[in-house]
């Protein structure tokens, strides 16, 4: 029998097939009875185009012996991209580079931990910084400072993609770690995250809520469309050369840039929210004809491009995304926000708990914390965001574009997202405290006189 629930004003619900159903009863708010109007099955109509949770399947698994709840709360600023030309070649292209107001927020524990890291370090709030800031000390050698950090390096090209939302986020975590700043003054690696939660074996996602508000006008019509999807709705190109990471399909220090720094411009070109004029390294046509116009195609050394894929404003709208109008086009109220809520693992196979630190791990290293052993960077849900406009390039499909500009001492945010997320850590590893006490009291019985 289905579970039932009752709410005020005579509302009844029943849990069937993975979600709560509102029972279609006659309304009791008025003196006379009125039949409830069927709104053309709105939920079924939307799910016919995009189903954020394509099925549920519950599997009875043993629960962990002990658990701890972790909560995140903060704000994410979706900003426009910047360009930092350092030589004449990049400076010549800078006047013809355009970016699109698109973003992608992945719900995974790794990026939430990065979003809550220290505010005074590399590429945190405000975007990438060309160098590492010293936490305490001003010596040139890392061993002479505490914590051990390097001074900012010169002639570097920092960059980041729109998917690195945690760089422009201010996130609080509860419970707090009072020793996190001194233990991890730099950006936390997978090894650092594993050591931070070394006593826990499993983790699961409980709930994440997003509230998105458009903050910048782009003409007379510029709503921000947002759509929450299960996992990665768009699959990235799986190329052997750039598939060292099983999920993000990128290589640290390669394309797309992940916030790293390098000495040469040609090694790590900034591609933050940049789109290529045409795909790099097009196929070479050996035969030519006398008709048509000669077109010179760019190769990978001339085009700034990325493997990342984002949805346009028209695509999100066609899939049933919500719209948030900026102030000035609509009065600001609760309905000005796009509300999204993601619950559970979003896994049709019903895998509720995921591996944080593999069992039997004595020394935590990056190899143990990387997939498939650890699922710390598993994407449970993804929020796709794009701002539309009435004047856009044809191949952008209604997405607002802008000319890239050099960085100034302030960021230009076109949307703000409020986030609340709840996670839980679990542990199935023995021994229990009383097992340890029993072992201590019986371990040396044979050696006693």
Swiss-Prot record:
Inducing factors: VP1 and VP2 are detected 12 hours post infection, while VP3 only after 24 hours.
User: Which cellular component, as a GO term, is one annotated location?
Assistant: host cell
Localization in the cell: Host nucleus; Virion
GO terms (molecular function) for this protein are: DNA binding
As given in the record, the signal peptide range reads none
* Annotated function: Self-assembles to form the virion icosahedral capsid with a T=1 symmetry. This very small capsid (25 nm in diameter) allows the virus to be very stable in the environment and resistant to some disinfectants, including detergents. Essential for the initial attachment to host receptors. After attachment, the virus is endocytosed and traffics to the nucleus. The capsid protein binds and transports the viral genome and Rep across the nuclear envelope.
By sequence similarity, the record places it as follows: Belongs to the gyrovirus capsid protein family.
What do we know about how this protein assembles, alone or with others? Answer: Homomultimer (Potential). Interacts with Rep; this interaction relocates Rep into the nucleus.
**What is this protein's name?**
Capsid protein
Native species = Chicken anemia virus (isolate USA 26p4)
State the encoding gene. VP1
